[in-house]
Structures are given as C-alpha cells and as structure tokens.
C-alpha cells in the first residue's frame, strides 16, 4: 500500500509539474527573435529559425507575413475543383503572396469545411460518420472577409450555420486558437492537437494587423513542428487577439511572388525532403492582392 501511495504521489507531482511548465524563456525567444525581414509591397515577410532545443525544447522554423491595417493589400480566397499547388492558385490570381487555406478531402479533392468565394458556396461542412447535424473539431472557427479584411467568428454547433451569413467570402477551418486575447482550451485526446505537425494559422492584432504564419515540421533537428497548444502560444506571443488554425501538415505552404524556388519560401514536407519542392496540391488558399 505504501508503495502504491508513493507511486500515486510521484505521478501527481509529475503531472503537476507538466501542467505548470514555465514558458517564459520560450516567449522571450519569440518576442526578441532577430527575424530576417523583407519589406515588400504593402506587407512584410519575416523568417526565423530556432535551433535544436531553442523553442519548446525543439528546433522550429517560422515564416510570418504581416499586413498592417493601413496597407492597401487585401485578402481573398482562391479555389480549384481539382487540387493544385498553392503557387499555382496564387499565380492564376495574380497574388503577391499566399498560404494554404482550409481542410479538404485529400483523395476526392473537395473542401470538407464551408467555403464561399464571391458569393458562391463551393464547399460545406461535411458531417461526421455518426452525426449529420453537428460539426467536426476542425470546423469550429470561421474566417470572413469584409472588403478584404479578415474577421474571425465562432460558429454554433450546427454545421449549416454559415449558410445564412451575408458575407460573400467565408472560409471555415479550426479550431479557434485565440479569442479576445485569450488562448482557447483544446481537447487533449487527439493527436491532431497534441502531436507536432507543420501548421498554418491566421491571426489579427488589436491594431488590425493581419498575420499569416507557417511553421515547418516533420524535419527532425531542423523543424519539428508545433502542437496546437504550442501554436496558440506562438500566436499570442506575436500579439494576436484572435487567431484561427488552418490546414497543416504537408499542406502548409507560404508563397511570395518573385521569390526563387517558384515563390515558395518555406520547406513544405510533402516530398519528405528538406527543400522548397514539397508542395502538396490543395483545394484552396488565402491570397494577398
């Protein structure tokens, strides 16, 4: 019995220590990072590589687009009925920059989250296997564009909620990462949440600045990727008051026009090589015009 009590106490102390991890050093590393900065036409590209063990006890490679509220640049959505690379969607649209958008069926190619572009509904929130009414975990945040400016909303559980919205450009993804300056608690029973993956996210600062973040992943010792709680922390350290998670993994891609390597600035992992050639064909993208 004493041994059982001792083991239980040790487990409790271990879990308590885990729950009280001190992220102050990580936050300072993000806030004080000497980003490689490219000032572009109405927006800024920033890049920073955290070496092995430097951020969340791991190596991380972050790519960030910042669009000031005063910029003439606007966001839009691009889509194709057949998955194509982010660079292709961007070039067809004459975009200055782009990141991958929301989730899609990798086999069939269709969106699995609600998508409306220029007033035309192109995708719906696909139901779960046992539930035709409620939405899935990655459908619990909605990105709306008003004159090219992003607004993030939390939908209700009914998966058809977006259909009644008046905005002409709507993209559902998720989950919500930050709302009103606070991190949103995430379910911890899914590898989608707890495991490290490549990530793409959109955030908004209080002053109206829009952030588009891509975190590379799946490259041990170079870029291990982020869990969703780690992604939340990065976004809040970057000053976001609201933020939404987008499709990630092999889909995570950032494009900047006129850059080398077909405009791809990060290291997409779909080809499993640490280069700029690993774009995954996707259903949709967020573009900067």
Task: Kindly give the residue locations of the regions a language model identified.
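Short, conserved active-site entrance elements at the starts or edges of catalytic domains
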Residues: 166-189
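A residue-level signal for conserved active-site and pocket-lining positions in enzyme catalytic cores
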Residues: 98, 202, 247
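Short glycine-rich loop/turn motifs
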Residues: 59-64, 139-140, 174, 196-201, ...
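Short acidic-glycine loop/turn motifs at beta-strand connectors
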Residues: 68-71, 118, 144-150, 179-180, ...
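Zymogen propeptides
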Residues: 20-142, 151-152
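Bacterial Sec-dependent N-terminal signal peptides
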Residues: 1-24
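Conserved, well-ordered active-site substructure
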Residues: 109-131, 188-204, 212-238, 251-289
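Solvent-exposed loop/turn segments at secondary-structure junctions
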Residues: 72, 102-106, 158-160, 191, ...
């Amino acid at each position: 019995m004493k041994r059982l009590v001792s083991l239980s106490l040790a487990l409790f102390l271990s879990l308590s220590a885990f729950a009280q991890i001190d992220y102050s050093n990580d936050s300072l590393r993000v806030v004080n990072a000497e980003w490689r900065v490219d000032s572009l036409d109405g927006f800024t590209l920033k890049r920073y590589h955290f070496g092995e063990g430097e951020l969340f006890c791991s190596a991380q490679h972050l790519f960030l687009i910042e669009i000031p509220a005063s910029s003439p640049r606007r966001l839009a959505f691009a889509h194709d009925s057949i998955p194509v690379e982010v660079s292709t969607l961007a070039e067809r649209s004459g975009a200055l920059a782009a990141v991958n958008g929301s989730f899609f069926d990798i086999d069939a190619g269709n969106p699995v989250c609600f998508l409306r572009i220029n007033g035309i509904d192109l995708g719906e929130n696909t139901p779960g296997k046992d539930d035709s009414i409620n939405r899935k975990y990655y459908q619990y945040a909605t990105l709306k564009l008003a004159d090219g400016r992003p607004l993030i909303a939390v939908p209700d559980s009914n998966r058809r909620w977006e259909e009644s919205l008046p905005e002409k450009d709507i993209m559902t993804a998720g989950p919500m990462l930050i709302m009103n300056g606070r991190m949103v608690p995430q379910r911890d029973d899914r590898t989608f949440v707890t495991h490290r993956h490549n990530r793409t996210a959109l955030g908004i600062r209080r002053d109206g600045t829009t952030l588009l973040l891509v975190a590379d992943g799946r490259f041990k010792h170079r870029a291990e990727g982020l869990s969703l709680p780690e992604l939340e922390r990065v976004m809040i350290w970057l000053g976001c008051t609201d933020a939404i998670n987008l499709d990630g993994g092999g889909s995570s891609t950032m494009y900047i026009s006129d850059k080398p390597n077909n405009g791809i600035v990060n290291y997409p992992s779909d080809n499993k090589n640490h280069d700029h050639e690993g774009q995954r064909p996707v259903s949709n993208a967020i573009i900067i015009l």
